[in-house]
Amino acid sequence: MDELKRSVIIIAAFGLTNIAYAQSPQINTTIIGSGSPDYNPERVSAGVLITQGGTQILVDMGDGVKRNLEKHGVDGRKMNAILFTHHHLDHNADFSPIFTSALLGRGDFLVAGPKQTKDFVNNNINLYDQDLDYRLGKTQRSLDERLDHLTIRELKSGDRFNVDEIKVSTLSVPHTIESIAYRFDYSDQSVVITGDLSAGPGVAKFAKDANCLIIDSGGMIMNKRGKKQRNKTLKSEGKNGAQKGKKQHAHLNIKESSQIAADANINKLVYTHFVLGEIDKSASMKIIEQQYKGEVIFSDDLMSLNCGNKTTN
């Protein structure tokens, strides 16, 4: 009888463990847009979707991101957070339709980013207030009512907050305007999205031991540009950071990004924000592998990433 009771207890405990696991799925990361400001029929502009269970977080929404979200089957009315790395057009051009979808939902949601985010969002609301009221009126709701469920937040380096069970932290990174990198942690999984940046201090520490580092592909060698681009990349190695009395570069190069990944002990280095043209992966990898020995991914639109438990490189 005692043996039977022990068996029942073990089976019940195993069942509860499985239920808990089912209720706490891993982070899923999808590159919604892997392109740059250039029009590219194969890549839309910047966007990354982080999901965990029913939680949806969109980081950046350049031109074409709304269309790719639809292709991916995302219900924009259930978006929990819309985050900007910075306010360049290739990172925020699709905000209006994505924001409208979130407003037409019924849950609370957050819009956050660096300085000017509040003005950007409020200008959008003021411009489209009659249209938004009309759309919401079809379900007997008003814009004022829905705005009670919206939080707009301007972020600075070192801010920490939660979106449901996902922990979010921020780091200011050097670019041509104020820019923020994000880190998402859930259980033992972590994803870092840098947005656009030039070389600067603190990124490796911020990204330490992350499963996936999604980073600016500045300086990537492209077949279309051939030897000229390759020589430019090699010449600029280690020189793209901000230096006293010298011009601030908009983007780091692949030696610098791969060094960050190595210093941070990253599991997977994921490149995005590609310019128009064909990537010379072989030539680029020769530079990257001098610093970083882990897995390297050249992302494409709608690519799903496995940013789960870390494996030994």
Task: Give the ranges of each region predicted by the language model.
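Active-site neighborhood of phospho(di)ester-bond hydrolases with catalytic His/Asp-centered motifs
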Residues: 58-62, 79-90, 112-114, 192-195, ...
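Active-site metal-binding motif and surrounding structural segment of the metallo-beta-lactamase
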Residues: 63-112, 209, 213
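Bacterial N-terminal signal peptides that target proteins for export
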Residues: 1-8
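Divalent metal-coordination and catalytic microenvironments
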Residues: 29, 48, 60, 69, ...
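Cap/insert and terminal regions of metallo-dependent hydrolase folds
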Residues: 190, 198-303
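Metallo-beta-lactamase
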Residues: 26, 115-179, 187
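Conserved beta-strand hairpin/beta-sheet module of binuclear metal-dependent hydrolase folds
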Residues: 23-72, 179-194, 212
